[in-house]
Amino acid sequence: MKQLLVILYSALVVTNAQLPGFSFGPSGFGGFSLSNPLFNASFAPANPVDRISDIASRFRDVANNVQRNLPKIPQFTNPLSAFSRFARPTSSSGSTNANSNNNQNFNSNQANEGTSGARNAINEVLNRIPGLSGVPRVPEIPKVPEIPSFGNPSDVFGPFVNSLRNMTNQGINDPGQMFNQVNKFLPDVSRIANSVANYAKSAANSGIWKNISNDIKHEMQNRIESMTQMLSNITSAMKNIAQSLPNLMQDQSLNTTLRNQPFFFPGHSGIVHLFEWKFSDIAEECENVLGPNGYGGVQVSPINEYLVSPSRAWWERYQPISFEIKSRSGNEKQFSDMVKRCMKAGVRIYVDVVVNHMAAPGASAPLYGTAGSTCDPQARDYPGVPFNRSHFHADCQINDYNNATNVRNCELAALPDLDQSNRFVQNKIIQYLNHLLDLGVAGFRMDACKHMRPEDLKSIYVRLKPVNAMFLFPPGARPFIFQEVIDLGTEGVSAKEYTNLGVVTEFNWCIAVGGVFRGTTNADALELLTKNGSAGVLLPSSQALVFVDNHDNQRGHGAGGDSILTYKTKRQYIQAVAFTLATDYGIARVMSSYNFSDPDQGPPQDTVQVIKSPGFAANNSCSNGWVCEHRWPEIRKMIQFKNFVAGSSLDHIQATQNTFAFCRGEKGFIVFNNSENTITQQYHTCLPQGQYCDIISGEVSQSTCTGTVVNVDANGDAEITLPKNSIVAIYVPSRLS
């Protein structure tokens, strides 16, 4: 029985939180009236047990009254966008910010341990309620003498605490939903009040009280008094917030600004596609190369279970069998570790997601996946999800790219075409993507969006969680989404149909830069690939992801054909990548490849088909069959150039048939020669007078330049000699004097 009294005492201690700044008298707030026997009545019973019973009974009545009188909270499609500015980010350990009022150390007595869960839950709610940043939090339970040990108090308070904790967790992700659940929460308050009353009555043994110190009795009486004010003020606060919600909330669920931010850390930019890399190798690359050199993020190849093909071709990753995280790159534990390590290095992770289709039929059935699942594509049977024939579009092949319905409802290369309008299919996709968000990813590359209806993708995107704030994302921010849509302006599906959903891959960029640096197009055409010059030619800059090549078109698949530059034409390829990183248009992605001669060839592997690690060669390039364009000095240093000039204007364009030059404010200058001839010319660099080291031909080492030195005069001009197919890039950090 002593244990029971300690439980009751602990519960009353937990309620000791004052909420100044809210006035809610018996007459109500905003037309809301509340009959309030608990707030205003005096307490007649002198016996503490009777007093507890009385207060519990009144607490129950008030909870029921609040439930009846609280106005219906309106539904909001996406209230988080407006509400998130009030939320407090959490640290990677899950605790609130270190200077928050609730960061107190618990003492080790068992009474404190028994109530710590409730105390944390209540304090977290207070931290999340707008306008209560200065409100004192539930204090530590004072050290109580002569308290015996006791069991788990959750038998009495578990339902209440669990409801509060669940509501808090939901409220962090969706505050509108939290307030809509108030009515569901109040019955738990009523039920626990009944429980308290019943337990209190059973404790009416006067002999028990003789063994409890007077200090505890007085403390319990004081806590009972404060409990009434606690309920009054919390009710007032909830009512106040609930009534103001309609003015705060706006449906911005389809506002593209919520999905076009890649969440690069300060001083970082650019995405690297580490095609077919293992998770453990990606983590090391983040720590050793990407983070230190200012890369912003990594696109990883599809990570969920996919077909095991006889030849282990690269395209097997694009034939999913289930959504279990297990691939040639590693398992879920290794993936989670990679995300955390890359985040600590300042590098974000974006997952390539394949949800347009499932694995295609093979020569026989069943087919086997990388996690051990089997499937029968001919029967449309994928038990690892599970999907069956009802989850797919009718059998047909794409044969008319001018017909959007044919492109979206029929099969791409005999791959069974999922019906994304099917609610079950949507739910499975959303569960998978939300799980990845829980693991800390920053967003997704959505494969084959051209073959899915925008309205179906919209239905999926609006139901995704925010990015996980535990990984240092802004509270409530939506995941970055970049969608593969091949649109060269000649087919029935347009990339512009997808720009209100997120960023779109701009394949016209690949063709344009490839043409210029192959020499088939004049250099002055590069002006069309700047933010100001691209209007009407390319997608708006904020809606475009740009790249020189990707895993498809470097193998002759998709768009571009012979215009596409790859690592196999190194000099021109470096020029194209350097321009992509130096200009002010779009979000840039750099390809990181492995050597191949057969377009179907998979990544480097050992004798048991385990992917080889890239390793480090003497010059910091890759070994074991990997190309690693992102490690090439010219590209690595252009990432640093890009980060330094970020936000500055692109101006003073100086263009001829074979050269193209421009300034990035007064921070940097770059010039390109796309001809087979050496060209010497005077350029305005916009930089202060001095000697500068060209970061393409060399770098600054111990105050000297290992490459070409450019002399800039007092007017900011310089005479520069450009060898054939070359670049000169200088910026403030490369100044020697």
From Swiss-Prot:
Residues 87-116 are annotated as: Disordered. Monomer. Residues 90-112 have a biased composition (Low complexity). GO terms for cellular component: extracellular region. Keywords: Calcium, Carbohydrate metabolism, Chloride, Disulfide bond, Glycoprotein, Glycosidase, Hydrolase, Metal-binding, Secreted, Signal. The keyword Membrane does not apply. Its EC number is 3.2.1.1. Disulfide bonds join 286-342, 396-410, 622-628, 693-705. The record marks 552 as: Transition state stabilizer. Residues 1-16 form the signal peptide. Residues 17-260 are annotated as: Not found in other alpha-amylases. The keyword Repeat does not apply. GO terms for molecular function: alpha-amylase activity; metal ion binding. Binds 1 Ca(2+) ion per subunit. It comes from Aedes aegypti (Yellowfever mosquito). The gene is AMY1. GO terms for biological process: carbohydrate metabolic process. Chloride binds at residues 445, 550, 589. The lineage of its organism: Eukaryota, Metazoa, Ecdysozoa, Arthropoda, Hexapoda. Glycans are attached at residues 40, 166, 211, 233, 255, 388, 403, 532, 595, 619, 673. Pfam families: Alpha-amylase, Alpha-amylase_C. This is Alpha-amylase I. Its cofactor is Ca(2+); chloride. Transmembrane segments: none annotated.
